[in-house]
Amino acid sequence: MSADPRAARTRARLHEALFEACADRPLGEVSVAEVTRLARVSRGTFYLHYEDLSALAVGASAELVRDAVDALHASDDPPAVLAGLLGSISQHANVYRGLIGPGGGGPLGEALHGELRDRALVERRKRAVQPGDEAIASAVAATFTGVVAGWLHGRVPGTAGEVAGRIWGMVVALHRSL
């Protein structure tokens, strides 16, 4: 993507328009025409930046992926940071449900898993390379992604705070397991 500030502003407007369009219905019911109307850009401008609505939604979710990685590695109160992140996810649940399946698959699920795995592996290796680091890093990523996906799709009950506490407990247990 371009570093041009005008392009960044256009992408930000498209992201906001997408979240606005999905405020009361799922991503699958939203059209490019509606998003471009809300963002006040042409279809041609849309397609200069994104291939389709799914690509726009993944782009709009990039900040969520960074925030998730940071939340799991917060130095202060990780469960509280995770609860805040889950609260933010629930505000745009219609977008995120369209990008992450109930089992954690889909473009957002894959992005979350990959980024979380990479960061967990880096953090574990700061302490020294251990046999099983790759497995633990993958398990941490899968746990976070799977629980968040299950919660988004109504398969994991609880408030953002309760689910954050459960995720944190599982992640800590995984890191202690080898």
Q: Would you name each region that the model predicts?
A:
Residues 71-75, 99, 124, 151-155:
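Secondary-structure edge/capping motif, primarily at the C-terminal ends of alpha-helices
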Residues 18, 60, 64, 68, ...:
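Hydrophobic recognition helices of helix-based DNA-binding modules
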Residues 8-19, 23, 28-32, 37-40, ...:
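An amphipathic alpha-helix adjacent to DNA-recognition modules
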Residues 1-8, 127, 177-178:
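N-terminal intrinsically disordered/low-complexity leader segments
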Residues 83-84, 103-146, 161, 165, ...:
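Amphipathic alpha-helical packing segments from all-alpha helical-bundle domains
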Residues 1-3, 43, 73-90, 94, ...:
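Primarily secretory-pathway and cell-envelope proteins
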Residues 30-31, 97-99, 108, 160:
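Short, hydrophobic secondary-structure boundary micro-motifs
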